[in-house]
Amino acid sequence: MSDDSWAPVLNGIPAPGNTFVLPEHKILYVSVTKVACTSLRWMVADISGEDLESFYTGLAAHQTRLMTIHRHRTHWEKTPQLFQIPKSLRGPISRDNGWLIFAVVRDPWSRLWSGWQSKFLVRHPFYVKRYGEEDWFPRVPESQQDVVEDFARFVFAEPWVTNEHLFEDVHFKTQTYSVRPQGINYTKIYDLANLDELFADIHAHLKGLGKDQELYLPRANETPLPLIPAVLEGGVGEAIQKSFQEDLDNFGGDWSLDKVRTKGASWSGDAIKHLQYHTVANERIGDISLVARQAAAQLRKSQELVAELTGEVEVLRARERARIVPRVRDKMLRIVKR
């Protein structure tokens, strides 16, 4: 039963798919890619009571076990998406009814840098296959300058706007697209720089329900190279700001190019070598994933064939029984009449 005075969870928009609903814990998390979403999904899965180890069996080209949390949502058994909850039952899902409805955002400069590294620079197999021939696809770097130049080329090409496939990729869409700040009535939208505030609020929320617990927060999907000032020089930072101005308008009260957090002034030679290792490892992961998926597809076909043949055998058996039983019955009747 809902109270008409409660703010509805949605403001006239379709229920989005990037949502994780925990009815017993009165939590609704709206996930945003490249904003601690791997760690936050593990946290949500643990609170919800999902079988965490079951995620490891996915066959996609995930770089680590922790990345398997991104396998298809059909694998989640206890954490529905908002659209899976009938409209008639969504009334109680409201910040005014004690629900914690939240999303997390980050400045667009570090987010794009993170997305470019994890998908392109380390050569994620899917992205190599789909975009490897594009002019803006980065080379395997030999130096810091290679990385800086290739990121600049990517930014100025703006393929998340011009490429029809990347245009649909949520890793490179605005955060506004995922968060829908005007369409969802949030308890709060948190900044990645202030995650401790989110965790404190989650603990307080769970404690109020008598369900407080330790939060499972594995650190995952770290980018091999931290953001350094050189990455945003030469007009790159300004170009990113222009492209993602919508996010700055909606969330960026404390964001500005001169406040972007960087770490160090340069990368060591070892850091570049470590990055090179990532590209080689991802290539091999892609090989193994492809073989595994092909084997799984062949197994499904074999199982379908077995089921089909089993059905045909049963039909033949039924026909044979229908043919033989009357004969046997007639023969027995003749014997009885003698």
Region annotations inferred by a language model:
Residues 1-315:
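Membrane-interface amphipathic segments in extracytoplasmic regions
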Residues 301-338:
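Helical coiled-coil/dimerization "stalks"
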